[in-house]
Curated annotation (Swiss-Prot):
Subcellular location: Cytoplasm
Native species: Clostridium perfringens (strain ATCC 13124 / DSM 756 / JCM 1290 / NCIMB 6125 / NCTC 8237 / Type A)
Principal location: cytoplasm
EC number(s) given by UniProt: 6.3.4.-
Gene Ontology CC: one annotated term: cytoplasm
Catalysis performed (reactions): cytidine(34) in elongator tRNA(Met) + acetate + ATP = N(4)-acetylcytidine(34) in elongator tRNA(Met) + AMP + diphosphate
Protein name: tRNA(Met) cytidine acetate ligase
InterPro entries: Rossmann-like_a/b/a_fold, tRNA(Met)_cyd_acetate_ligase
GO term, biological process aspect, one: tRNA modification
Family annotation (HAMAP family): TmcAL
Protein's UniProt keywords contain Repeat: no
Length: 402
């Protein structure tokens, strides 16, 4: 079987996702699709709009054959760890031939070239990176500038204003990290990319006759009503959303505030909360009335909005240094969220070709720190979304789509 892997959040599943899935099948000419999907918390450091089982149903309705969960520790991390967790999981299955992801540039050769430089770290590139970091630039910005300078020195023929745009676009950054992970793992999986169409990844406005971003759809659902988003998602996705409840960001803020006020040292356990940002958060926690307000009071050139969101999410989930160290290795299990008939065949192939632990029912799963953290994350998510009960991971079986 020719199997394609895709890495998603489907938060929620919209028309852009539908196009990506269809195009991925066409460009790779595959027999089946495995989707690695974030669980109940996502890469922005927020609870998913709706739970992982509802989003799994959306994926299966759309034509994904097998949905597996990206462990929460990777799902709530920076692009580098998010990508490594997802790619290493796909690689460990030993059945995936291709990976297909969206990017703003749609240029797989450029993405591969950039990721190759980053993974090989030529001495001159390392020197430039060090210099830009000394200037106080955040790591992603410093790396982008170092890459541009290195390529310029090596007479790489490219419009540098275009390259700067490439290096500062969300999906391109993830695409580079996906390829970097493939190089790191010496994987035989072949990468493909599809140019992202429609609204920008971070665009929060819904515009008629344009594919909306998930950010805009979420904002519309939270601030007005779900009916406004009908034109921007498939009917099956809309119907599933209409019959579920959404996570409550105000409740998340209350829980984060409680965690920090009751134990200010909680921030010291999170390596990303360094360089005095922990003190800044503590100073502003009493002044803010919402998560958004707290982040805006604390953000700086070095600490972006999303980076702070992830730090606060890790406070909520009580992440510590020992847990974070697990991100350096590939997950040694795969949690099955749902499948169709073809997905069942793919699972048989995984069992034949891979030694990875396949988790269908938690009651039969081997003890694993990453898996235990996922269970805890779902239990915390149950405080934010009334559709989810404590111990839902034990109570809900994989979705079987017929």
């Amino acid at each position: 079987m020719n199997i394609t892997g895709i890495i998603t959040e489907y938060n929620p599943f919209h028309l852009g996702h539908e196009l990506h899935l269809k195009s991925s099948k066409e460009i790779t000419n595959c027999d089946g699709v495995i989707c690695v999907m974030s669980g109940n918390f996502v890469q922005r450091g927020l609870p998913a709009l709706t739970d992982k089982w509802t989003r799994t149903k959306m994926a299966l309705e759309a034509g994904v054959d097998l949905v597996v969960e990206l462990p929460t520790l990777f799902a709530t991390s920076s692009a580098e760890f998010f990508a490594f967790g997802a790619v290493s999981l796909l690689n460990s299955l030993n059945v995936v031939n291709n990976i297909c992801f969206g990017s703003e540039c749609g240029d797989i050769d450029l993405i591969k070239k950039l990721s190759e430089i980053i993974i090989n770290e030529p001495p001159l590139f390392k020197e430039y990176l060090k210099d830009y970091l000394k200037e106080g630039l955040p790591f992603p910005k410093a790396r982008s500038k170092a890459l541009m300078k290195y390529l310029d020195d090596n007479n790489y023929k490219i419009d540098f204003s275009y390259l700067e745009k490439v290096l500062n676009s969300s999906n391109n950054i993830l695409a580079i990290e996906y390829c970097k992970s493939l190089y790191k793992l010496q994987s035989s999986i072949k990468p493909f990319t599809i140019q992202r169409l429609g609204a920008d990844y971070n665009d929060e406005k819904l515009s008629k006759n344009e594919i909306a971003s998930a950010s805009a759809i979420r904002k519309s659902i939270y601030t007005s009503n779900i009916e406004e988003s009908l034109d921007f998602m498939p009917e099956y996705s809309y119907n599933l959303l209409k019959n579920t409840s959404f996570s409550d960001l105000d409740k998340m803020f209350d829980l984060v505030k409680y965690a920090i006020v009751s134990n200010p040292n909680v921030l010291k356990e999170i390596p990303e909360a360094s360089e005095g940002i922990d003190n800044k958060i503590i100073q502003n926690i009493g002044k803010a009335n919402s998560l958004d307000e707290l982040i805006n009071l604390c953000k700086s050139k070095r600490y972006s909005y999303t980076r702070l969101n992830r730090i606060l999410c890790h406070v909520l989930l009580n992440v510590n240094k020992d847990l974070l160290s697990l991100r350096k290795s590939s997950p040694n299990y795969v949690r099955i969220l749902g499948f169709n008939n073809k997905g069942r065949e793919i699972l048989k192939e995984i069992k034949k070709n891979s030694e990875i632990n396949i988790v269908n029912k938690l009651s039969k799963a081997k003890s694993d720190s990453l898996l235990e953290f996922d269970i805890k994350a779902t239990n915390i998510y149950s405080f934010l979304n009334p559709s989810v009960k404590i111990n839902s991971d034990y109570l809900i079986s994989p979705i079987i789509f017929r």
